[in-house]
Amino acid sequence: MPKYPLVLDCIAPHYARRMTDATDARLAEQYEAYPYPQRDPRDEAKRLIIGSPSHLREIDFWVFGAARPRSRPLRALIAGGGTGDGTVMLAQHLARAGRPGDVTYLDRSAAALGIARARVEARGLSNVAFHQASLLDLPRLGLGPFDYVDCCGVLHHLPDPAGGLAALLSVLAPG
């Protein structure tokens, strides 16, 4: 039985139509050819890092109710990390705040991963681990558990969105 059966029961009807393997393959080719969002790592020296949902203050307040000790290392997963916006922002916030923790980037696109890695390197960040894989493979990768998971704009692209949510929940730390 899934850890969060109610969540899965609520979303499963919305994802009853699954994409075909051919559609999934075309989508993978698209993101390999056109990594999203378009970013140039040479711009990192002048690029602002703003946004949501991976803003450290928002995570502290909205996810942990401002009750999580800041001295406790934060393990975060950015699933479907694309060209690295969420990864760069959260890793930079942790580093600037002198907070312990690490960010795990996961995306199936080698092209997007290459851009994300170059952006992280351009900023001199050392608190990011990169993995090229589908988030559907998370339970087999042995990467968790994570205190926080960011998966924005990804599930609807999967051949099995409910399975994707189940995979994310499987690596989320208790509590």
Segments from the language model and where they lie:
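N-terminal, positively charged/glycine-rich alpha-helical extensions of SAM-dependent methyltransferases
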Residues: M1-G51
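Conserved alpha-helix/loop element of class I SAM-dependent methyltransferases that forms part
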Residues: A33, Q38-L74, M89, H93
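A short acidic, Gly/Pro-enriched loop at the edge of an enzyme's catalytic core
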Residues: P139-V149
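A short SAM/SAH-binding and catalytic strip from SAM-dependent methyltransferases
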Residues: D147-D160
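A short glycine-rich, Lys/Arg-flanked "PGG" loop and its adjoining helix->strand segment in the class I
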Residues: A162-P174
